[in-house]
Amino acid sequence: MNCNDYPMYGFADKAEVLDAARKYWNPDKTDFWVNEGIPLVIGKREGYVLEDIDGKSFIDMHLNGGTFNLGHRNPEIVDTLKDALERVDVGNHHFATSGRAALAKALIETVPGNTMGKVVFGSCGGEAVDVAIKSARFATGRKKIVSVIKACHGHTGLSIATGDDRFLKMFNCSRPDEFAHVPFNDIDAMERALSGNDVAAVIMETIPATYGFPMPAPGYLAQVKALCEKHGALYIADEVQTGLGRTVDFWCFEHHGITPDIVVTSKGLSDGIYPISATILNERAAKWLYEDGFAHMATFGGSELGCAVALKTIEITRRAETVEHVKALDVLYSKRFAELLEKHPSLTEVRHDGTIAGLKFQGEDEPAVRFCKLL
């Protein structure tokens, strides 16, 4: 791999790194992977390949949940950051900058139909979801948020309440009067949740990622959007893991025939080079920005370095050759997955759209775990 040696920061080997991680960082997460037989400490990384610090190479099919869509350490994006560092830093979030204005304009222009009006920047997806929820509550004067059971929209203050009970209970974040959860692809359950006309917004990943990438049933998302309009709620499309060209279209919701009121993006927006997130709002959702622009502040939100990197990421993603490459991968994966389904009876279902894929196996966890270890 053509990249610099990975810094060890004084540790002699992997065992020392893992011991320090247990002691000073996260004992449960460290031991989880070790006990599963995956004692991975990522060292060198480039393109779609990464190395354990012991030298074993892996094809990175996880990509940190869609963070490295254009590959680890994409040379064009690295050069963009280096160039920006010669002239700017994170800047001051209180004042307008050319980079922030340019990125906001570029993001608004990615959403079809000229429907979006403003962009609020942050540094991670959870923060962007928090902004989306606050915007919807201000716009509607309502408090209740509806999400999908087993969803994951982040782990910050408001976003965690939209997700798995496992984390809500741990941090005493359950708020059943404010946050409701319904099964994915169950339009009747969604209608019941909205029928009280007290919901500020429905938030959905276009394809729920940590839920195993179940595909939306034909027409389901359009029906949800129609219910939102009927009952006065906003529709928040969480495209943190499904957007930025991963399903051929720039945003996954485009080929489901919907126009969200709010779009959330992060992760791959900077291809893993500099943290940045964005909450894209239509004019209704952006009303609070006219009343009190200081109502949400983030020191590193829309940093000048992050904006430079994100602009380059969008430019590369929208190139014709990038789009054609994703189309070709979509066709290739469809063919190969069909062959795998025919060849391996333990594989019962493939959930696939563009470069996104989830594989369902017979039984509970064991076949899937065994498959992952073989990789």
Predicted segments — roles?
Residues M1-L375:
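Conserved N-terminal phosphate-binding loop of PLP-dependent enzymes in the Aspartate aminotransferase
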